[in-house]
Amino acid sequence: MDEGGGMARRAGRALVLLGAVLLLARNVLWYAQTELPALQEVLADVLQRGPEGALSGEVGRLKTYELLGDVLIDAYLLCATVLAPLLLRGGGERALGPLAAHLLGFSLPIIRRVALTRTRGLLMALGVAALLAGAALLAGRRPRGGSVPARYGRAAGDVATLGLAFLSGVYLYTACCVVANEFYAPGMAVVAGQMGHAVDRAWVALRLAHFVAASALSLLVGVERPGSGWEAGRGRVALRAVGCAALAVLMLRGIAEHYRYYILLPRLQQVTICLCALCLVGEALERVGSRLDGEASRAAPEGEAG
């Protein structure tokens, strides 16, 4: 490895660790400033009035479910943040790109909601930016060898991989909003009635299950897409992409039709379908390219022998 490449890798590893530290600092700050006081208030209400009494009023229910939603979101962010240095240590640097894209998709709505002038919003933005920069430095340059279909197939697969990882983060935040708004908060029933539908908790639970499956599949596409020699994935990626597309479209179409005020979901659905189609095209091009490269490598010794 040349000196420039070694410096880039060291800088990339440092940026990944810095991003993880910043995101952990944001989690600790948010817990100390928001969740701990809310937890103390809810526990005091439960001790004073009992669980049924504390949850009997509208305000009590909303406080409890708000706290539950915040804890779930922060727990997920904590797990994803800890995963970054673990991948770095375990040699899974190739998976850092999809992980950073996934965290970007999840955190963008939070960063927009929490202004960058606030410390926790700034820490999250800087942490995600450092992770992205570190993952880009560690990825380095792709090998330029091989036939034209193989090169274009690798490029299409990379774009689809990062796009699906990003959208899986958006799906996660959307699902958290759907569950928090429709499943827990009683006040949303009034809004739902005004929009011409009733809150269907079984439906929300089913959409959440669709989301979990779609996110898992899209992350698998990102983590396991390339082989050790950048060869084609022999259909595994294409199969996962099709499954991811089917589940994501089911979830997004159902939510968009049932809850009209999630206006962004139809557009996300279209982008998801396009990315999964791009993933399939990239897989096909890589297979064609690997076949052409194999034929060319076999023909070269025969030409030399002749």
Regions inferred by a protein language model and the residue ranges of each:
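Alpha-helical transmembrane segments and immediately adjacent membrane-interfacial amphipathic helices
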Residues: 9-38, 63-143, 153-189, 193-227, ...
